[in-house]
Each structure stands twice: as C-alpha cells, then as structure tokens.
Amino acid sequence: MKIGTVTGSVWATRKASCLSGHTFLVVYTGTEELVASDQVGAGPGDRVLLVTGNTAARYCMDAPVDAVVVAIIDKQETREVY
C-alpha cells in the first residue's frame, strides 16, 4: 500500500468497456505521480491510501488498472523508532 495526495483528475470519454463507471485521479506519492482508479470519491487535496499492481487489478474485478484509491485518510500518526 502507498500513501499519496490527489493532485488532479483524468477524464476519458472513450475507454475500454471494463473501465466503464471508473473515475480516475492523479495521485502524487512523494516520489512518483500515478493515475489511479477512484473507488471512494476522493478529490483534490485529499490524502489517500492506494493499492498497486496485481492487488489493484483484483480489487477492480480484473480491470486493467495499476493503482486504486481504496481509502481517504482522516488522520495519520507517526512515531520515532529507535
């Protein structure tokens, strides 16, 4: 899983039938920008949780996607580890 911030949207009026109903977001993870299928209604500025790779395709019933937004992060805590 990866954490990222939604920076934009992608619109595609013509797409494969298996992607019908999907909306797409541009998500920046701090090291890369990804286009992800949005399953939770995230919007610009939202911090989100992503799944990528084979897990993403399985999550979307084998649609040809590499990344899926599966959660909007409300709060994140980090602790120092020694």
Describe the predicted segments one by one:
Residues E32-S37:
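Short alpha-helix capping/helix-loop boundary micro-motifs
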Residues T5, L49-L50:
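Hydrophobic beta-strand signal
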Residues V51-Y82:
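C-terminal structural segments of small proteins and small subunits
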Residues R14-K15, T23, D38, V69, ...:
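Solvent-exposed, flexible loop/coil residues
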Residues M1-V27, T31:
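N-terminal first-folded block
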